[in-house]
Amino acid sequence: MAVDKKRKNTKAPASGPKRRKTQPSSKQIKRPVSVDALAWKTVDIPEMFDDAEGFFGLEEITGVDIVKDGDVVKFMAAVPKSEAEVEDDGEEFGGFDDEETPKPAGNADQEVKTSETKAEAASTPAKEKKASKDQRKPKEQQKQQKQQKQQPKKEQPNKAANKKNAEDKKKARKNEKTTVEPKDPELETDLFTKLEELPEPEEEEIDMSEWVPLDLSPRMISSIAKLRFSKPTVIQSKAIPEIMAGHDVIGKASTGSGKTLAFGIPVIESWLSAAETRKQNKEERKGATALILSPTRELAQQIRDHLQALCKGLPTAPYICSVLGGMAVQKQKRQLQVADIVIATPGRMWEVMSSDNSVLASLRNISFLVLDEADRLLKDGHFKEAEEIFKALDRPPVEENNEDQKMGGTDEEGQEEEEEDSEEEEEEEEEHVNKRQTLIFSATFNKNLQQKLAGKSKFKATSTQDMEYLLQKLNFRETPKFVDANPVHQMAENLKEGLIMCGDMEKDLYLYATLMLQPTRRALVFTNSVNSVRRLTPLLENLNLPAFPLHSGMIQQARLRSIDRFKANEGAKKKNGSAAILVATDVAARGLDIPDVDLVIHYHVPRAAEDYVHRSGRTARASNSGTSILLCGPKEAVPTQRLVAKVHAQAEVKAGNSGNNTKKLVSSGLRTIDIDRRIVAKLRERVDLAKKIADAVQAKTMGGKEDDWMKKAAEDLGVDYDSEELEKAGKWGGKGSSKKQKQKEAQQMSKGELASLRAALRDLLSKRINTGVSERYLTGLDVSELLKGEQGLFLGQVDGLGLDD
């Protein structure tokens, strides 16, 4: 009996309808098709290619499989099925029958009957009803047989019924317990839903009267009021009227002065007016309104966030998208099809434009071309893609007739047509250029600031030469209006600058001392190389400081994650109350508006004076105050003197006119900071241990990568890899040999030695630094001040950097 039951259970699923019939059948099948019958499509050649080397008239096909059967090649293409083929594909699933039961084993007569009824149904559609009745008979017989088999076992249905009654009783008891009548009628309603009905707290009214002279729409002024900007900045009050009047503008203002809204407000105002006109005339959208280029990805993301925040208060807002590296190209192409304002970096923008003619066609009709941090974008030897973008936007669209003329025609006719085409292209180009406003903004347009501080050149460019340089790089439709918000000073007004003189090998020590003297101020540390960022970040982390890296070698998601953590001041509460620290290269030097950055430290002297201006501009933004400190070694003394002379050039002229010497200039621009040598000496042991640990970890990581690379190279060349022979051959006594030897020693450090170093550093960090206070006698101490600084690093009174006075 057990065997029969097993057979019955195994055959039960076979009698039911198959699951695959519930899935919709495909309406297309692939069949062999001749080459001429395929749906070929013409390949669009990018307009940027002046010479396609004869590859004209190319066609492509998709969705075709190539099958090779011996020497015969077949093209299998998708062909729609006919209605008859779709009907024959299988019977439609009509649901499960209530009385359907599995077939009993060995019932051959019933199987014959069902097969006969199926054959009759297939051959004679008129007998469908009869066939269905014949199909029901074996089902009834199956049911009777099943009941007969179950008659000896009468206890089974009784047990099932009793079990069901018990479950019903349990459910009823459970419902009685859960349904409790509320004693208070007010509790019957959900009070949390009423919170949505409560009126929002009224915000304080802001006086926006100073925005009225700029001739902005009421909805724009209302949107600005929601951002809590009561009055425009100097660059905004000067640049917005000129842009609204339709002029090309070159705007110069110090860092943190609101340059983004200076060009963002007119661009959005133009889109709003154009959208209303299209709505009234029932016209379709022709393309994007503005293209905004920025040198870095982080700045592009920030511009997008600022403009989106401005558009939140508008009833209808433009669609703003960012096109930058590190993100999916296909998604960006889809966004460009509907984008009204495009914010991009030159590299990714050129990649998309050069591969898709539709993107280039939509951007040719833009009303605004904006260059933020234009001096960086237009710098010689940088961002060649930006120049290609300008040329592509100025080039008139290529027509099909012109392409046909390129492929055929006599020489004389070709020359005449080329002359006519060149004249027409010049006229079209002039008309095309005149439609677009060009806006460029930056904090530094002086070419003198772009020169390397370590060089020997003494070239000094005048303001007229700077303007000529910009006019040569860009095709303005008119002489641009030059708006200078700070003609005298390059730096922000509320910025305090300091200079710390130290040894070349003591920069790590003085960096740590500076951060410890300002523990509650969020700091941004700038270096000149990616390797320095990779070395300093673990060094500061070993010293229990929340440090985050940012450099060009990181993927885009890691960059954004570091910036978000720094903005959120993540880890400050866990790491002895110290504020967050961002260690970055010049990637973070331009445009980034990170709130509450109080301290900027230049670990290396910048390569150019403009880099110092933009680095220091990350603090003291708007009306806030900030501090910029430069760590200078003996080898960097000459570049530092040149830096001071170039950055404070206007102050030098004023000092010369008043009879002062240049030495007073240094004291007025950069104040020398003297840190207590006793504090530095007591911090030295901590820094040395942290440096050894960081160098050992980095050497082990880099050593493993180098070995893997050498092994792979040896395998590719078919050479045996012997690390000892390579080490002997690679030994030399020249420049860099001592550094290589130190890396090797750090790489050979064992885990036990590394653990002992960590334990020693942990012990030092758990103690507070005594600054000359007697721990035995408290008579000479201010106990209240001591209790206030209980969680501080120093035991006793410590003077700060001395820049606040």
From Swiss-Prot:
Identify the SUPFAM superfamilies for this entry: P-loop containing nucleoside triphosphate hydrolases (SSF52540)
Classification via PROSITE patterns: DEAD_ATP_HELICASE (PS00039), HELICASE_ATP_BIND_1 (PS51192), HELICASE_CTER (PS51194), Q_MOTIF (PS51195)
- Composition-biased stretches, type Basic and acidic residues, lie in 110-119, 126-143, 164-189, 390-406
Q: Where do we find the motif Q motif here?
A: 209-237
What InterPro entries does the record point to?
Answer: DEAD/DEAH_box_helicase_dom, Helicase_ATP-bd, Helicase_C-like, P-loop_NTPase, RNA-helicase_DEAD-box_CS, RNA_helicase_DEAD_Q_motif
Domain called Helicase C-terminal: residue spans: 510-666
Catalysed reaction equations from the record: ATP + H2O = ADP + phosphate + H(+)
Main location per the UniProt record: nucleus
Q: Which domain of life is it from?
A: Eukaryota
Q: Report residue spans for region: Disordered.
A: 1-33, 79-189, 390-435, 729-751
The identity of this protein, by name, is: ATP-dependent RNA helicase mak-5
Origin organism is: Neurospora crassa (strain ATCC 24698 / 74-OR23-1A / CBS 708.71 / DSM 1257 / FGSC 987)
What's the name of its gene?
mak-5
